[in-house]
């Protein structure tokens, strides 16, 4: 089988090849007699249902499901918009309005409609009950609304002549209003290999969220996936057969009885059934010494791993590139897999970003030193609330394979969707959900009583967390109940056939949910693509046509080379005062042009502002005339006035512009300083800026009065300071003695 096939098709074909299982049901006498009693239509439906169960790709599965909908008359249900399950009139009205504005090229009204009307669950269109009446898809009006949304975004970014910064700002705010989607993978020991099939199906359908979280076995799969780029994922999935998940240590040279005695002895001595050294070695071979920050910088995926503290007084932690940027991923995975009684609890390790030295996380902190962690599924199998707080996540795709959870969720009415369900089955699910809720509340109350009586309070607290957690999401992917029969494989190293079998089950369980995920996340993913396109367009156009303008004419910054110079300034040097290595760029020494003067120092604002203003009327002192003065002497001077230089930050590098030791004419006197630079006259500053005329393309706001929205995603930022046309020429020279550029947030974004 060639690995040029789609990933899921290759894996499922390989599974049938190794298991000697036919891709279709074999004929039998009973089946032949049963088919004789069916009509031609019923026989065709039966054959298609059998083919659907044994499909080896989503395209094949979806095609068969669509044919079944046509044969059974369910396609007609999709074309009827009227339903009490959602607000179909709202969707109809908004679709018509967007189509009208798009065809009439009224892009400003269209953008206003997007900003004010787009939400994720508009008119309850994400109701799971809308996906129980057909084999695939749902109401046609929902598909029409999402297709029109994509057409609208395409027209805005390709056909409208709007300012790119302005359009980008509106779309970014709309995306924040809609929220993010996160994929959450549960624990489940070797049943966690089920997640591989889920990832393969979502990746092929281009529905992979950026935020991925994993606990225990889910942390293993999520971490391996998140340390590989999008281009590396296909080869990673097709080579899954070559992966050796040597998690549970067994000495193959000894008999099973001898291995059992060793495990019993270890459990009596240490309280654990297995040694975690094979787990550590396996994770090191898969992940290396990558940290959360390094993985995010490499792939752009936000990996989250949950760990539970071994102490009763600590809260569960969600590790990611924000909360634990320097923590080694393999140590977080091993800690998240440390199920009590199975693996010993382990500490976390981090890598020093400067020296690369590996040490225990929090070793310099007395509170965290010698702190150990265990299985993340114990306290927080699905960290939904923390993901919402940190990454604006409001839509969860959950994959649940915990052996004590998914059989109960199969009977829950919150995990339906993607499969046809009769009314009697729905009522049965509802009753089961109520009964489970009753027993769960009673169990929690009983555990609280035992804890108050101080009967093993640590154990009672952990057991209580098992019942208080949320194990499902907006879309929940569950394995078939037949997987319970493989319980004996839970604490064994997976064989190649078992791995392929779990992958096959995961892919097939995901296919019925694809249409739900497409509709729930359609606008979000379309906005992500549009925002990415606009950012690339802005970067390319800015680097070619519109370099960043500073407050002096013809003074520009070349971002790539960090070359900052003014051709009319005599002898400007670029010097780096940080650890990064940058080349020193010198402009040709020229004689100062008439009326032009070298860059002057910018003193910090103080109470002696008026005194400095009067001092400017006197000739400024000439710089040092010693040509042998080394560059290091400039970096060692304490104040900006003494150094006679301008320092500012670009990213992580601190750059310094210094004057060359050339004799230059003194500053001419001027009569009146512009009121714009008086820090105590903010009202007049706004008045002067309003009267200044047109706004350049570098401004965050545009001339449109409908959307005065900043174009910066992580906070507003007035970029008009970079436009020299906003200031008169007499104010240009005055700006050099003011704290005009001494704003820490100017280069922050």
UniProtKB/Swiss-Prot annotation:
Residues glycosylated per entry: 270, 289, 297, 304, 321, 474, 589, 680, 714, 742
Organism: Saccharomyces cerevisiae (strain ATCC 204508 / S288c) (Baker's yeast)
Limits of the PNPLA domain: 183-388
Locus of motif GXSXG: 214-218
Protein name: Triacylglycerol lipase 5
Record carries keyword Kinase: no
GO MF annotation list: lysophosphatidic acid acyltransferase activity; triacylglycerol lipase activity
Catalytic activity of the protein: a triacylglycerol + H2O = a diacylglycerol + a fatty acid + H(+); 1-(9Z-octadecenoyl)-sn-glycero-3-phosphate + (9Z)-octadecenoyl-CoA = 1,2-di-(9Z-octadecenoyl)-sn-glycero-3-phosphate + CoA; 1-(9Z-octadecenoyl)-sn-glycero-3-phosphate + hexadecanoyl-CoA = 1-hexadecanoyl-2-(9Z-octadecenoyl)-sn-glycero-3-phosphate + CoA
């Amino acid at each position: 089988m060639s690995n040029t096939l789609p990933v899921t098709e290759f894996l499922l074909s390989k599974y049938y090849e190794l298991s000697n299982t036919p891709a279709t049901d074999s004929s039998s006498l009973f089946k032949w007699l049963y088919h004789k009693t069916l009509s031609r239509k019923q026989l065709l439906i039966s054959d298609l249902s059998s083919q659907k169960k044994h499909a080896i790709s989503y395209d094949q599965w979806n095609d068969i499901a669509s044919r079944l909908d046509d044969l059974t008359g369910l396609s007609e249900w999709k074309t009827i918009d009227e339903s009490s399950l959602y607000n179909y009139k709202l969707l109809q009205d908004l679709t018509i309005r967007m189509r009208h504005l798009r065809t009439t090229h009224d892009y400003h009204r269209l953008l206003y409609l997007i900003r004010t009307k787009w939400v994720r669950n508009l008119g309850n269109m994400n109701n799971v009950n809308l996906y129980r009446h057909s084999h695939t898809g749902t109401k046609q009006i929902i598909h029409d609304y999402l297709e029109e949304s994509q057409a609208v975004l395409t027209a805005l970014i390709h056909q409208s002549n709007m300012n790119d910064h302005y359009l980008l700002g509106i779309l970014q705010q709309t995306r924040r209003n809609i929220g993010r989607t996160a994929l959450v993978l549960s624990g489940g020991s070797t049943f966690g290999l089920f997640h591989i099939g889920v990832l393969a199906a979502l990746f092929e359908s281009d529905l992979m969220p950026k935020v991925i979280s994993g606990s225990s076995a889910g942390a293993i799969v999520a971490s391996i996936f998140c340390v590989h780029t999008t281009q590396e994922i296909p080869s990673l999935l097709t080579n899954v057969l070559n992966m050796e998940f040597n998690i549970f240590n067994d000495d193959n040279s000894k008999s099973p009885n001898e291995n059992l005695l060793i495990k019993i002895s270890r459990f009596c001595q240490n309280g654990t059934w297995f040694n975690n050294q094979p787990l550590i070695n396996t994770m090191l071979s898969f992940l290396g010494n990558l940290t959360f920050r390094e993985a995010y910088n490499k792939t752009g995926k936000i990996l989250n791993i949950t760990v539970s503290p071994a102490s009763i007084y600590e809260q569960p932690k969600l590790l990611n590139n924000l909360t634990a940027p320097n923590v080694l991923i393999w140590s977080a995975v091993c800690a998240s897999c440390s199920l009590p009684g199975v693996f010993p609890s382990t500490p976390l390790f981090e890598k020093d970003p400067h020296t690369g030295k590996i040490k225990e996380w929090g070793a310099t902190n007395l509170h965290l030193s010698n702190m150990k962690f265990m299985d993340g599924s114990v306290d927080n199998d699905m960290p939904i609330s923390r993901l919402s707080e940190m990454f604006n996540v409001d839509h969860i795709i959950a994959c649940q394979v915990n052996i004590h959870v998914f059989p109960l969720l199969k009977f829950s009415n919150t995990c339906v969707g993607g499969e046809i369900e009769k009314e009697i089955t729905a009522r049965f699910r509802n009753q089961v959900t109520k009964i489970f809720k009753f027993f769960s509340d009673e169990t929690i109350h009983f555990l609280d009583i035992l804890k108050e009586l101080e009967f093993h309070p640590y154990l009672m607290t952990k057991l209580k967390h098992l019942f208080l957690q949320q194990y499902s999401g907006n879309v929940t992917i569950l394995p078939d109940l037949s997987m319970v029969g493989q319980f004996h494989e839970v604490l064994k190293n997976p064989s190649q056939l078992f791995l392929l079998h779990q992958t096959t089950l995961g892919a097939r369980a995901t296919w019925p949910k694809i249409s739900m995920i497409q509709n729930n996340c359609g606008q979000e993913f379309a906005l992500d693509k549009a925002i990415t396109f606009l950012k690339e367009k802005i970067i390319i156009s800015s680097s070619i046509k519109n370099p960043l303008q500073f407050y002096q004419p013809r003074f520009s910054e070349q971002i790539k080379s960090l070359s900052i110079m003014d051709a009319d300034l005599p002898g400007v040097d670029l010097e780096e005062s940080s650890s990064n290595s940058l080349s020193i760029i010198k402009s040709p020494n020229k004689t100062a042009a008439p009326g032009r003067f070298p860059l002057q120092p910018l003193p910090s604002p103080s109470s002696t502002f008026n005194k400095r203003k009067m001092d400017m009327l006197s000739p400024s002192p000439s710089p040092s005339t010693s040509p042998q003065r080394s560059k290091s002497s400039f970096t060692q001077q304490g104040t900006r006035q003494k150094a006679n230089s301008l320092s500012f930050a670009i990213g992580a590098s601190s750059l310094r512009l210094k004057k060359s030791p050339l004799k230059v004419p003194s500053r001419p006197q001027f009569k009146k300083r512009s009121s714009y630079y008086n820090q105590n006259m903010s009202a007049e500053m706004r008045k002067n800026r309003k009267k200044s005329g047109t706004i350049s393309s570098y401004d965050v706001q545009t001339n449109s009065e409908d959307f005065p929205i900043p174009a910066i995603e992580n906070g507003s930022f007035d970029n008009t300071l970079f436009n020299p046309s906003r200031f008169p020429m007499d104010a240009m020279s005055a700006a050099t003695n003011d704290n005009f550029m001494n704003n820490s947030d100017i280069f922050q974004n």
